Amino acid sequence: MKRVSVKNYLVCLLIAVCAIFVFPANASAMHIMEGYLAPGWCISWGVMCMPFLVIGFFSIKKKIEVSSKNLTLLAMCGAFAFVLSALKMPSVTGSCSHPTGVGLGAVLFGPTAMSVIGAIILLFQAILLAHGGITTLGANVFSMAIVGPLVSFGVFKLSKRWGAKAGLAVFLAVFFGDLMTYVITSVELAMAYPDATGSFMVSLGKFISIFGFTQVPLAVCEGLLTVVIYNVLAKYSAKELKALSAIY
């Protein structure tokens, strides 16, 4: 059987990215959209993101200095996340449901590195695809590029410690990271738009319940897809993954 290199998968992902630009999704399908949050919330979420982005920058720099091949893997993780997070399914007003794609990168490179990649992805989507917005970038980064990868990384490490097989550990990491992204998105929306009675919890329950109908199936599908890609990388880039402590 002909050996398939990691570069071929990267090329396929880049082609998919180009296809998104050629056949863009409807602009009504997006992350928390431009102008949907009050300025105070936009500033607050943005400030909360800054420490993670700074730490993530140095984390990426260190990993690339260790091996230049990590740059190819990181680019692939970024392309994978870009493609998946651009696949929109309409959900509650002002937002949407979609895979996040950041779980793979979190497992391979850690959560802080993926926070930088996720922020870049969200910025490009806001500017070029009208997905999300500039003012709401901080809120979207916090939920998808910070909390999601943190949860995925934590679940992967715990699963590894408890003796779970690599495939199961990756699936659980991606699944829970995906769901937690939307829990945080629901928190952001509930804080900005509490129930008419003034209850945060009532509003949060409404947002989470609506997101759940679309996000749970998407999280399962993303988990299965990520396991397939992880297995391919583990087969053809085992040395690099071992160096990243992402294989066992």
From Swiss-Prot:
Taxonomic classification: Bacteria, Bacillati, Bacillota, Clostridia, Eubacteriales
Cell location: Cell membrane
Annotated keywords: Cell membrane, Cobalamin biosynthesis, Cobalt, Cobalt transport, Ion transport, Membrane, Signal, Transmembrane, Transmembrane helix, Transport
This protein's name: Cobalt transport protein CbiM
HAMAP family assigned to the protein according to its UniProt record, in alphabetical order: CbiM
Transmembrane spans: 40-60, 72-92, 104-124, 136-156, 167-187, 210-230
Disulfide-linked positions: none
Protein's membrane topology: Multi-pass membrane protein
Protein task: Part of the energy-coupling factor (ECF) transporter complex CbiMNOQ involved in cobalt import.
Signal sequence, start to end: 1-29
Biological or metabolic pathway of the protein: Cofactor biosynthesis; adenosylcobalamin biosynthesis
Subunit composition and interactions: Forms an energy-coupling factor (ECF) transporter complex composed of an ATP-binding protein (A component, CbiO), a transmembrane protein (T component, CbiQ) and 2 possible substrate-capture proteins (S components, CbiM and CbiN) of unknown stoichimetry.
One GO biological process term: cobalamin biosynthetic process
Entry's Gene Ontology molecular function annotations: cobalt ion transmembrane transporter activity
Keyword hit for Nucleotide-binding: no
NCBIfam families, per database record: cbiM, PRK08319.1
